[in-house]
Swiss-Prot record:
It comes from the Bacteria. GO terms for molecular function: RNA binding. Gene3D superfamilies: 2.40.280.10. GO terms for biological process: trans-translation. Transmembrane segments: none annotated. The lineage of its organism: Bacteria, Bacillati, Bacillota, Bacilli, Bacillales. This is SsrA-binding protein. InterPro entries: SmpB, SsrA-bd_prot, SsrA-bd_prot_CS. Its main location: cytoplasm.
C-alpha cells in the first residue's frame, strides 16, 4: 500500500480529484473573504474543496459548494458551511476569467486552499472537463511512465 502524501506546510485543503477530472489550462492565486469562525475552522483542517466551483456574477467572482465545517466553539456566531464566498482579484483578471468561462466547456475550479504570510489564499484554475477516454489515456500514460522508472531503477 502506498504511503499517504504529506501536505506542504501552508496547504490547508487540496482538490486532488480536479486534476483527474479536468485539464487545468491556467492557474491564478486569489484572496478569499472569510468570517472569523471560517478561518478558525480552516486552520483546524476542516475544509473540503471537492465539488466546488467558481462563477463570475456582476463583475465579482464567488466560490460555490466549498464546505467549511462549523467551528465547534463558535456557538451562535457560526457560519453557513456551504455559503458562497467572494474571491479577491483585480478587475481585469475577473474579466479575463469571465470571457474564458463563457466559452463552452470551461469552468473555474478551486485547486488548493493555503496560507501565505498568515493570509488565506485560493489557487483557482481555468479548466476544461475530461472525457472518459481522456482519463483512461492518462492512466495508461502514467502506468507506462511508472514501468519505465522501474526498468531504469533495476538497470543501475
Amino acid at each position: 500500500m502506498s504511503k499517504k502524501k504529506k501536505k506542504s506546510p501552508g496547504t490547508l485543503a487540496e482538490n486532488r480529484k480536479a486534476r483527474h477530472d479536468y485539464n487545468i489550462e491556467d492557474t491564478i492565486e486569489a484572496g478569499i473573504v472569510l468570517r472569523g469562525t471560517e478561518i478558525k475552522s480552516i486552520r483546524r483542517g476542516s475544509a473540503n474543496l471537492k465539488d466546488s466551483f467558481a462563477q463570475v456574477k456582476n463583475g465579482e467572482i464567488y466560490v460555490h459548494n466549498m464546505h467549511i465545517a462549523p467551528y465547534e466553539e463558535g456557538n451562535r456566531f457560526n457560519h453557513d458551511p456551504l455559503r458562497p464566498r467572494k474571491l479577491l482579484l483585480h478587475k481585469r483578471e475577473i474579466e479575463k476569467l469571465g470571457t474564458r468561462t463563457r466559452e463552452i466547456g470551461y469552468s473555474i475550479i478551486p485547486l488548493k486552499l493555503y496560507l501565505k504570510h498568515g493570509v488565506c489564499k485560493v489557487l483557482i484554475g481555468v479548466a476544461r472537463g475530461k472525457k472518459k477516454y481522456d482519463k483512461r489515456q492518462d492512466l495508461k500514460d502514467k502506468a507506462v511512465k511508472r514501468d519505465m522508472q522501474r526498468a531504469m531503477k533495476d538497470r543501475y
